[in-house]
């Protein structure tokens, strides 16, 4: 123990009371936890006891209920205590459920049958309505849509009725003559007097028959209003005047006034005398009575004989009877001589007989004529409308074309005005500055050159690091920067082809070089310092590039073919450019500068010395002819085109070479031979300074003109 106490740490004297407090607090906490646990256990025990008591109470209640039921209904329970009533009730419910399902099925069937019956009834109703509708349509067609019947048909029917009646009664036809009002005879007057006497004697006997005749006349009038009449028959009836009947020996039971009344009614209405046609339905007895009454008073159909002959005239004799209808017996009468009638012209129309066939043909012809007339009118209207439409379209098109033409001319004039204003501004600037600003490179070209130079430097670093991803990214960026290189070349060619620039170049004695330095860098060694060191072998740089880039033999063959094509095309272009340059300078020497026509023959290069007295200024000479000016403009335009083609050839060779190479090989190629990266901007400043000094110097003649001319003509 002593050894153990030696290892215990000795607490400091000042902190002993803190340790005691900690121990006391821990003891209190333990006591509290124990008390809480005991309380929880007691609560759980109490809950369990309560649950047990509740279960016991429920069991007791159930037992009491069963005992009460057994006391009330002892028959329902067996000896074993099974409830028989509950079993029976369950069976009853099951049976009721089965019956209920059957009833449901029967009700559903009844509903279906009712639905089918209703549908059948609806179909029957629909059929009935359709049948009724069809019947009504047929009735309407029968009543109102009958075919058109000519009036001549009714006349033929009436004549048939009269002929049948005459044949049945054996009445012979009576010949009567038409007499004019101007030519009257004594015999006719005698017969008329006899008839009048007979009529006066028989007036009293025939009063009873007047009522029947009036009724018949009313029926005839009603029927005549319904039927259509023929105009020719009416005219024939109007012409009948003074009908004479020889009835001296006849007992007249029939009233002669009836005939006159009937004729007067027919003539007053301008209608023929026909039997009545009653369309209205009547009784059979009434119809028979009317027929009997009408048969008594019907007038037979008469034939008109205009020829005056002595043939005997047969007149009917009527036997009077009271109870029966009159019977007609023919009697012979002695003929009376009648004076011949001289025909006199009357304004009455000529009688014309028409048949149903002729009327139908005439109607068809009229219908066809009306159709043709209507069609011609429609065609004329349509042609007129089409002509108007075409005229309107033509006028609209003409106006639209006129507007478009005027608009095109206005656009062209506006463009010409813009170009003229631009040229005037350029001329004013050139007069002030002397085309110094024109020879300076544009800001876009300077920016493109600086961007290409930075990209080539980055490519060089990525090649040293062997970073392929950065190489691909930089190559894409390089091609994006040089997208507008063709437009820059065209802009620079326009600057060179300017007449002011060519004038200054001819003063200086500039001649274009045989090869462009950018194109030479493709196959020759590159000199960063720009010194005049010449390389004996043209393929020195090209061979080193093949070794560094590990070019395959297929690639080398393709590159050789590209080189051959490039040299061939560039040589032909250079010759054309050189010829144009000589022609332009000869124009300036002949028409602008004051020198002899053949300077080489009269002057030697050593003897020619600059002297201001031998020359005259440009302003003292007149301008050349318009033809010569136009020739100069055409040559300058062709020079511009050739320069743009030469620059495009250079760029096309670079793009074709880059398409054959891999990204790493292309990067090596651009680092070695980039036309934009190896340009020194200080050279541009030097050229501008020299150019400004030449322009600002007073001009009286070209400097060392003889030497420049010798160079120019020796090249040719």
From Swiss-Prot:
Keywords: Coiled coil, DNA-binding, Nucleus, Transcription, Transcription regulation. Gene3D superfamilies: 1.20.5.170. Residues 406-413 are annotated as: Leucine-zipper. InterPro entries: bZIP, bZIP_sf. Residues 20-142 form a coiled coil. Residues 387-403 are annotated as: Basic motif. Residues 173-233 are annotated as: Disordered. Its main location: nucleus. GO terms for molecular function: DNA-binding transcription factor activity; sequence-specific DNA binding. One of its GO terms (cellular component) is nucleus. It is found in: Nucleus. Disulfide bonds: none annotated. GO terms for biological process: regulation of gene expression. Residues 381-444 form the bZIP domain. Belongs to the bZIP family. Probable transcriptional regulator. This is Probable basic-leucine zipper transcription factor O. The gene is bzpO.
